[in-house]
A protein has these predicted regions:
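Bacterial N-terminal signal peptides that target proteins for export
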Residues: 1-7
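N-terminal domain-onset segments
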Residues: 5, 20-71, 82, 135-235
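An exposed acidic His-Trp-rich patch
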Residues: 80-166, 170-172
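Hydrophobic h-region of N-terminal signal peptides that target proteins for export
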Residues: 11-19
């Protein structure tokens, strides 16, 4: 209950900070008639890598809304500027929800403990105290992330099938140039790490971050036989 209350209060603080930002003020009227978009109340920036290929790392801007006190949903963009490309989605669930998932399902999810403690995860534009409260709420959660647009390889369109993404779990995994690029946008990752040193580590479910065991999960495209019902409808 304490964690749930903290998550809700942190999300409220994020909503207030986001609502007061110039970007939100300027676009509020434009999104007023689009309730799902109007429900976005937090902006978080993280760095993902392709499951099975840590060499491919990408900064992702998350714009999030909450479905309940246990589930968040985020749309992901490749920048925070007008004309940004929508590259994916991330679903975030509480530890309680994650524990209820099957072993096979858990392989698709990543933990957020290291992202929070390392400073890799940040909430742009939010006051330091409010951001820290949000990170305390997120540290024990788990994310399931799909990227549909592989902008890192120069694709001009969202080509191919969705790609499962993962998050860092230890020092030395994030590329120095990626961290430097993100630091130019939102301040020192190292400073955030120091400021969060007193945040307690979350209990880690071994079902998440399966790639650490040496076997990563990724999608593959296959051809399936159309059903008789589908064929009849096409006639």
């Amino acid at each position: 209950m304490k964690t749930r209350t903290l998550l809700l209060s942190s999300l409220f603080a994020a909503a207030v900070a986001f609502a007061q930002s110039p970007a939100k003020t300027n676009t509020a009227s434009a999104s007023a008639n689009f309730p799902p978009i109007g429900g976005i109340h937090a902006h978080v920036c993280g760095i993902h890598f392709y499951s099975g290929d840590m060499a491919r790392q990408i900064i992702a801007e998350h714009y999030c809304s909450h479905l309940s006190d246990e589930v968040l949903q985020c749309v992901l963009y490749d920048s925070n500027k007008p004309g940004a490309r929508l590259i994916g989605v991330e679903y975030i669930v509480s530890a309680k929800v994650f524990e209820s998932l099957s072993p096979e399902e858990k392989k698709l999810w990543h933990s957020h403990n290291y992202e929070v403690k390392s400073g890799v995860l940040t909430a742009p534009g939010m006051a330091d105290a409010a951001e820290k409260d949000l990170m305390k709420a997120l540290i024990g959660t788990y994310g399931k992330t799909w990227h549909m647009w592989q902008v890192d390889r120069g694709d001009k369109l969202p080509l191919g099938i969705p790609q499962l993404m993962m998050a860092f779990t230890a020092d030395g995994q994030a590329k120095a140039n990626i961290i430097a690029e993100r630091d130019k946008l939102y301040g020192s990752t190292a400073a955030k790490k120091m400021a969060r040193a007193d945040i307690a580590d979350a209990k880690h479910d071994p079902g998440a971050d399966g790639w650490q065991k040496g076997v990563a999960v990724q999608l593959d495209l296959k051809t399936v036989q159309a059903t008789a019902q589908q064929l009849r409808r096409s006639e």
